[in-house]
Amino acid sequence: MKRLARSLYLQVLLAVVLGALVGHLFPATGASLKPLGDGFIKLVKMLIAPIVFATVVTGIAKMGDLRKVGRVGLKGLLYFEVLTTVALAIGLVVARLARPGAGMNVDPATLDTKAIASYTNGAQAHGTVDFLMNVIPRDVADAFARGDILQVLLFSVLFGAALAALKDKGRPVLEFVDGLSLVLFRIVGFVMRLAPVGAFGAMAFTVGKYGIATLLSLGKLIACFYATSALFVVLMLGLVLRWCGLSLFRFLRYIKEEIFVVLGTSSSESALPLMMRKMEKLGCSKPVVGLVVPMGYSFNLDGTSIYLTLATLFIAQATNTHVTLVQELEILAVLLLTSKGAAAVTGGGFITLAATLSAVGNIPVAGLALLLGVDRFMSEARAITNLIGNGVASVAVSRWEGELDQARARAVLAGTVPEEVEPANEPEPPAIPAGAGLHG
């Protein structure tokens, strides 16, 4: 009992199991518990924008050399593009080999498309230009109020750059933002005590509303997706961590609390503040974490990428739509564009799928109706894979920059360094280099 009282991940795991039981045995009660999960996620999202702001601003201001900021951002984007391309390709290959939709013989004309109307309408405004324009906020207050991570990130980079350019004159502001960061992470600690309650409510709602029968009806698709996500984590992300000199399984054990929070809430954002703190304590460069992790929530959605290609070919197979190899490559190319920013809008995965199917043309968009019932059961694997992918990304880019404290990272993963100890490579606050400026 003492271990349960001290261990957040055990509390969340127990809450997930109890929530599933309540949802299965008492469906109406389980469905009514949705506010518990929603409330917890809202509490976390309340903190994400200010935490991203404080972390990015202090990281850039202390870094001083703004050319380095650009270099880190470019390396992060390059890493994201390579890994998401691999994730999309793996989903495509598994769908070809496993054929989860084969034999369903669904007539698209018989499907009820009313439920997917909002997603197909949203696909009309999901182009690349719209996405890029959406990165620029109408005003700063609006970006923070809506919690738009990319808009907050853009403003934070500009604010940090301006602070670095001010040199000594900016020190009081930097001290304030640095202190604000400490306060925000302390609030995160308070909020995370409610994680078991949120996980219980979210899992009870999922099972109570959709039922186990829904899970079994498209079991092959769900099994394919979970297996593919696990394969990607073990092979690709494991390979990246090996290049960084670290063990994947020790890394997963290190972030187990965050994984179970995401498992219970089906939202990778619910663990974003904790993940940023964990990566810093692991020995990653604070400026790298501040830039890479928030960017990753729009550009490095590995789990979502696997889901998109798998779901696209599933719909084609279920509706007996023949897709040639050339068309599959076209799907891959379209998804490389449409998948960016899939997390920036509600129902982003479905909107991205609708946009892709519309662009490809020969796969019926009405087939999205097949996924509505089981999509919720795949969201946990999507969110967990996204979470792990963004954690590994911060380690990889730190290693690429030569700013990963590998000795500390190995010690932390081995459990020989208390997680509460601050990382050795974090800059001492709040010194701004005398020569810092916009041209570094």
UniProtKB/Swiss-Prot annotation:
Alphabetical list of InterPro entries matching this protein: C4_dicarb_transport, Na-dicarboxylate_symporter, Na-dicarboxylate_symporter_CS, Na:dicarbo_symporter_sf
According to the UniProt entry, where is the signal peptide? Answer: none
What is the membrane topology here? Multi-pass membrane protein
Entry's family note? Belongs to the dicarboxylate/amino acid:cation symporter (DAACS) (TC 2.A.23) family.
Supply the Gene3D superfamilies for this chain: Sodium:dicarboxylate symporter (1.10.3860.10)
An example Gene Ontology CC term for this record: plasma membrane
Disulfides per UniProt:
none
Q: Which residues cross the membrane?
A: 8-28, 40-60, 74-94, 147-167, 187-207, 221-241, 288-308, 354-374
Name the source organism.
Anaeromyxobacter sp. (strain K)
Q: Where does it mainly reside?
A: membrane
Localization recorded for this chain is: Cell inner membrane
Q: What does this protein do?
A: Responsible for the transport of dicarboxylates such as succinate, fumarate, and malate from the periplasm across the membrane.
What protein is this chain from?
C4-dicarboxylate transport protein
Q: Mind giving the lineage of the organism this protein is from?
A: Bacteria, Pseudomonadati, Myxococcota, Myxococcia, Myxococcales
Region feature (Disordered): 419-440
Give the GO molecular function terms.
fumarate transmembrane transporter activity; malate:proton symporter activity; succinate transmembrane transporter activity
Highest taxon listed in the record's lineage: Bacteria
One of its GO biological process terms is: L-aspartate transmembrane transport
Pfam name, any one: SDF
Its keywords, alphabetically, are: Cell inner membrane, Cell membrane, Membrane, Symport, Transmembrane, Transmembrane helix, Transport
Q: Which NCBIfam families match?
A: PRK01663.1, PRK13027.1
